[in-house]
Amino acid sequence: MLPHPTHDRLIALGLVGMAKAFEEQRQQPAVAALTFEERLGLLVDREAVERASKRLVTRLKFANLRQNATIEDLNTKAARGLDKALFAKLATGDWIGRRQDLLITGKTGTGKSWLACALGHKACRDDRSVLYHRVPRLLDALALARGDGRYTRLLKSLARVELLILDDWGLAPLTSQQGRDLLEIVDDRHGRGSTIVTSQLPVDHWHEVIVDPTIADAVLDRLVHTAHRLALDGETLRKPPEKSGKHTKLDTDTAE
């Protein structure tokens, strides 16, 4: 079937979804029985789906999540220590709309990073801006940015996202400068965006990570006292792999 001029106009207007649906309708004789409004509605619905799909791809690419995790893959039976009622509330994403924070703690292999990425993926699907960083590398990036004039711009980019994931907090003590960098991030986002922090350390030991006690007080005051908390223990949180091979089991030796 030769291309229809309307198809070409839709493409020129950037209405790719409508153009695809239009061509599909031309090849389906049964569509002729539909009213004009019904056919137009199908075209508009297809365009909306197409745009939502593109936005999700863009959101996920920008988020740069460490793991390809989704909340649907959570194995609640293996999730020992997980507050399932709280996680169900977190999965709705309402807490992000209220600009609240989340702290996830537990030993290596309990699925901290996986859970954080799963919630980040859900936020992307909810059309929210998300950004993932490992704390050690982010602090290195801020140190480099301070030297080449990008420091303020990098801080602004961290402040703008609706959900910032800070993974692997507290692997090593922070210098005074690193503590100040972290305070800048937390202060910029306080009451303006949501932050997920994952750590192997219990929250009660976080103060010890920051060398300067004054900065430690300021960081924890903004981040800890009103945040939701998930304390994990036990085995990995991923579902076992399906026969189709769609799901990859999370290795408890590498899960964080």
Language-model region placement:
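Interdomain "pre-motor" coupling segment immediately N-terminal to P-loop NTPase/helicase cores
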Residues: 7, 11, 15-67
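Short hinge/gating elements
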Residues: 8, 24-28, 72-73, 101-105, ...
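Alpha-helix C-capping/helix-to-loop hinge sites
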Residues: 25-29, 77, 145
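Short, residue-level hotspots on alpha-helical faces of the histone-fold
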Residues: 42, 46, 118-122, 188, ...
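Clamp-loader machinery-focused feature within the broader ASCE/P-loop NTPase space
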Residues: 50, 56-89, 97
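Conserved P-loop
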Residues: 82-160, 207
